[in-house]
Amino acid sequence: MKRIGVLTSGGDSPGMNAAVRAVVRKAIYHDVEVYGIYNGYAGLISGKIEKLELGSVGDIIHRGGTKLYTARCPEFKTVEGREKGIANLKKLGIEGLVVIGGDGSYMGAKKLTEHGFPCVGVPGTIDNDIPGTDFTIGFDTALNTVIDAIDKIRDTATSHERTYVIEVMGRHAGDIALWAGLAGGAESILIPEADYDMHEIIARLKRGHERGKKHSIIIVAEGVGSGVEFGKRIEEETNLETRVSVLGHIQRGGSPSAADRVLASRLGAYAVELLLEGKGGRCVGIQNNKLVDHDIIEILETKHTVEQNMYQLSKELSI
């Protein structure tokens, strides 16, 4: 394999640039040319592809977002769209592709593999919802962004003796909410993967207030419901002054943490190794600090789960 491509797809995550950098530098180290596909699968179809050199990825390891940009692409879901994308790759002599993104990006890589084009997926999403890896690129940075927000909100919550509901990202996965809630000392954590008892949450807040607690923090993953609605109900049923903060897209931005830069570098380089070994239809990950790879179809068919022992611990520590 003498030429490979790399693209970023779906929601951006801090560390994607570090992964792109690793792909380019690892490939060039092995005398393999690298082409960047801009705007994800949309760029594959439109032919927005250019050769990347060492200088192309200079000064990006510390930058958030993605140098290659990203976009949604409904056309790629069609056979015609995929065939057009593959034709553009073959026109340039590109023989394999590294896809950095979440489960939707993995689905695209799977489809390309089914068309006979070798792909390797690299998990890039702040949601940490890709099976087969302990952590995804961007999760640690997003987590630290949320923790920073919790700490600052706690200061004002204490000053005004208020309850705060903080809504974080996670439509289908509660990892950000769970980890941030545990690290931030939240009184309650609501995630899509676990049932919750609103009456118990209300009772716990009342008990805390009765014993002199000056503030409370509740973390809600967006997939559970609206933080605003939770805030209204809490204030109505507890008579405690309650405010809501929806963190939104700030969780996706910012300079990647050291952990995300290292993770992205390791996974990006490993993806190139797999392609050069002729292994397509795979995706990479990290488990127990060791690099691993899996069949991408198996990963797509595996349901993501949160660590139940951590969820239980969060309940035990929030009494």
From Swiss-Prot:
PROSITE patterns: PHOSPHOFRUCTOKINASE. It holds the Pfam family PFK. One of its GO terms (cellular component) is 6-phosphofructokinase complex. Gene3D superfamilies: 3.40.50.450, Phosphofructokinase domain. Allosterically activated by ADP and other diphosphonucleosides, and allosterically inhibited by phosphoenolpyruvate. Substrate binds at residues 125-127, 162, 169-171, 222, 243, 249-252. Homotetramer. Component of a possible RNA degradosome complex composed of rny, rnjA, rnjB, pnp, pfkA and eno (although rnjA and rnjB's presence is unclear). Specifically interacts with RNase Y (rny, PubMed:21803996) and enolase (eno, PubMed:22198292). Interacts with BrxC. Mg(2+) binds at residue 103. Catalyzes the phosphorylation of D-fructose 6-phosphate to fructose 1,6-bisphosphate by ATP, the first committing step of glycolysis. It is found in: Cytoplasm. This is ATP-dependent 6-phosphofructokinase. Keywords: Allosteric enzyme, ATP-binding, Cytoplasm, Glycolysis, Kinase, Magnesium, Metal-binding, Nucleotide-binding, Transferase. Its EC number is 2.7.1.11. The lineage of its organism: Bacteria, Bacillati, Bacillota, Bacilli, Bacillales. Its cofactor is Mg(2+). InterPro entries: ATP_PFK, ATP_PFK_prok-type, PFKA_ATP_prok, Phosphofructokinase_CS, Phosphofructokinase_dom, PKF_sf.
